[in-house]
């Protein structure tokens, strides 16, 4: 109860800070928006049964933007004092005087703003007990070591707890807030046999502490993952079907988010520039953005400009439905904001209601990719090339681990080549998706 009271007091302080900033801004004869984000948390790190680190953190920022007619000035600070706020407003207005006039800048249209924040069940405080957190982290390691003698070392076990408070206001009368919690636990272990040594990790992430994977199960899963990579082999260069496992498939669709972001669209720096309302995925595939998903990791009632978020289709029957727009790039494109200032919310990628095992059988022979490396994706032309590790699949069953491969292609072709998506949805990211089977891709090995 003490923690809840402290958070409520901090929230009240931040709301009053925004109110005071807006009150002071009435003297500068300009449109103003104010945003405060404050995160309070604690992290415990254990390695080989020894506490390596206990870290308390409190990080936040006050962001002020003024629009002096069509000229913009922005400032930020960690100092929330009245004296500093006055100084920030002076600096922001001075910056705007030296900024070039831009017809597309300005506050959102009032009809798009959020005046009543929706309750999304994001706040689940936990009275953090350091001793219990240490015990939970040690238990993850202990269960990993005990599960198999081939587990020989640990790279650490973590437990994190964070609370974030967001407050937004502007000179059009908006003053809204919401708070959220986020918990995570993580374990990374090293396995060794006569011929090789491999590492792997596992983790969970949730809004409620009780929804995290149990420490002993986390340790066992991590150990199993590390052991499964022992004896990794190299393979020949080939063209092959592949499956992106559900733990990494969100990355595959994150490139879509980049390609349809408003900045890339109005700058014509995306390969999808001419594809709005065009088919770019199989006709059975939908992607819904739901910012109002209860306890969702990407849920929020309003975006970073105070625009109310809404449920919408990104992809419907394989067809691209919308760009991802903030107010500025929306005006550039003569469109309306989609409430995506600050990024995407919860993307729910449809699947074909088949199990992961059925997906393996459907592929029959090919590569299961479980980890990707590098940043070799060019949104301008859609070219894709990334390092990967995973498993060779034979007759619909995982046969042996593989490493040191590169997969390459073009995103447009890769999206069109999606054969099926299984129902093993990973909910630890803003993009929730099952494992994805592609009919064919270039694989470079030996």
From Swiss-Prot:
Keyword Cytoplasm among record annotations: yes
Transmembrane segments: none
Main subcellular location of this protein, as a coarse class: cytoplasm
Subcellular location: Cytoplasm
Record-linked InterPro entries: Metalloprtase-TldD/E_C, Metalloprtase-TldD/E_cen_dom, Metalloprtase-TldD/E_N, PmbA, TldD/PmbA_N, TldD/PmbA_sf
UniProt key word Lyase: no
GO CC terms: cytosol
Pfam family, one: PmbA_TldD_3rd
EC number(s) given by UniProt: 3.4.-.-
Keywords: Cytoplasm, Hydrolase, Metalloprotease, Protease
Annotated GO MF terms: metallopeptidase activity
GO biological process: proteolysis
Function summary: Probable metalloprotease.
Similarity comment: Belongs to the peptidase U62 family.
Protein name: Metalloprotease PmbA homolog
Origin species: Buchnera aphidicola subsp. Acyrthosiphon pisum (strain APS)
């Amino acid at each position: 109860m003490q923690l809840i009271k402290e958070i409520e007091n901090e929230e009240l302080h931040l709301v009053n800070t925004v109110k005071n900033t807006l009150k002071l801004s009435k003297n500068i004869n300009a449109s103003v928006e104010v945003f405060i984000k404050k995160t309070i948390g604690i992290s415990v790190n254990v390695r080989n049964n020894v506490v390596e680190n206990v870290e308390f953190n409190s990080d936040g920022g006050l962001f002020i933007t003024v629009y002096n007619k069509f000229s913009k000035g922005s400032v930020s600070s960690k100092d929330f004092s009245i004296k500093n706020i006055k100084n920030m407003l002076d600096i922001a207005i001075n910056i705007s005087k030296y900024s070039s006039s831009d017809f597309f800048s300005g506050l959102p249209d009032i009809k798009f703003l959020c005046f009543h924040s929706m309750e999304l069940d994001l706040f689940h405080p936990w009275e953090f007990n350091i001793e219990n957190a240490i015990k939970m982290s040690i238990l993850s390691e202990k269960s990993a070591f005990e599960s198999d003698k081939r587990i020989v070392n640990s790279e650490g076990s973590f437990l994190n707890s964070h609370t974030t408070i967001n407050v937004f206001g502007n000179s059009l009368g908006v003053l809204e807030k919401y708070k959220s919690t986020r918990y995570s636990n993580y374990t990374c272990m090293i396995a060794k046999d006569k011929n090789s040594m491999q590492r792997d990790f596992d983790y969970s992430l949730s809004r409620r502490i009780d929804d995290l994977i149990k420490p002993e199960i986390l340790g066992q899963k991590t150990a199993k993952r590390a052991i499964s990579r022992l004896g990794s082999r190299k393979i020949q260069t080939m063209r092959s079907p592949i499956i992106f496992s559900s733990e990494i498939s969100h990355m595959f669709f994150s490139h879509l988010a980049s390609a349809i972001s408003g900045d890339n669209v109005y700058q014509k720096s995306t390969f999808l520039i001419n594809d709005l309302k065009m088919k770019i995925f199989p006709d059975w595939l939908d992607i819904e953005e739901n910012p109002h998903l209860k306890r969702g990791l990407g849920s929020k009632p309003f975006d970073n400009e105070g625009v109310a978020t809404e449920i919408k289709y990104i992809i419907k029957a394989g067809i691209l439905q919308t760009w991802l727009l903030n107010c500025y790039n929306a005006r550039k494109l003569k469109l309306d904001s989609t409430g995506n200032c600050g990024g995407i919310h919860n993307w729910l990628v449809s699947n074909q209601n088949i199990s992961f095992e059925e997906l393996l059988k459907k592929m029959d022979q090919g590569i299961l990719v479980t980890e990707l490396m590098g940043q070799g994706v060019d949104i301008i032309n859609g070219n894709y090339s990334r390092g990967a590790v995973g498993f060779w699949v034979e007759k619909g069953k995982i046969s042996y681990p593989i490493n040191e491969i590169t997969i390459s292609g073009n995103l447009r072709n890769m999206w069109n080549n999606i054969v099926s998506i299984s129902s093993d949805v990973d909910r630890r990211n803003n993009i929730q998706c099952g494992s994805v089977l592609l009919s064919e891709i270039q694989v470079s090995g030996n």
